Amino acid sequence: MTRVFPRYRMTCALPLAVGVVALPERCQWVPWHHSWIDSHAMTIYESFVYEPDALVYPNLANRTGCQMLMRSICDTQGFCAGATWLLAIDGVYVGTVQGVVEDDGIGLIQNVGIVPGHRRSGFGIALIGKALHGLHAAGAKTGQLDVTVGNVAAIRLYLKLGFTIDKTIYRTVAIKAKRDRVVVGALPAVTEPREGRRSNP
């Protein structure tokens, strides 16, 4: 049995002016360093484990999967350290974002995650702004992200920031019943006829 999840591919021209978000003094930006890879992974996990995207991308539903995902991102050609950030409050990580610049100048924003309990505080906008700045500084001309169609709040935010919906892509996930449990596994994403790229949530 399979389930198909529609996702919007959203893009923006760079540079994109994102309004300055006044963060509390207790907040700290933590730039990328390889030693923070597990901190990014755990923040991704805490941000997405109970969200619908954990069905779309099963790796998000467990810590090991998030570690594998984060290692895959930072090993990707075009990984953008300047677009990869942790946000901490009093030394506790509450937000994460990663970036990749492709050869054609597309800057991919990946895994914009805010830990529950710290949302609706402007942290998402701040993370996106940091990522876009880093992608542009690395040579990206266009910013791109994917968002699940049902994530209305995120879509509204991205539209407000200046992103536009470029196309709809479809991700098919295999769902297998096993003893009263549901086991999910991702199948290759498919897109509408127009050729496109795939990025993580």
Predicted regions and their residues:
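Conserved beta-strand in the GNAT
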Residues: 84-86, 92-101, 108-113
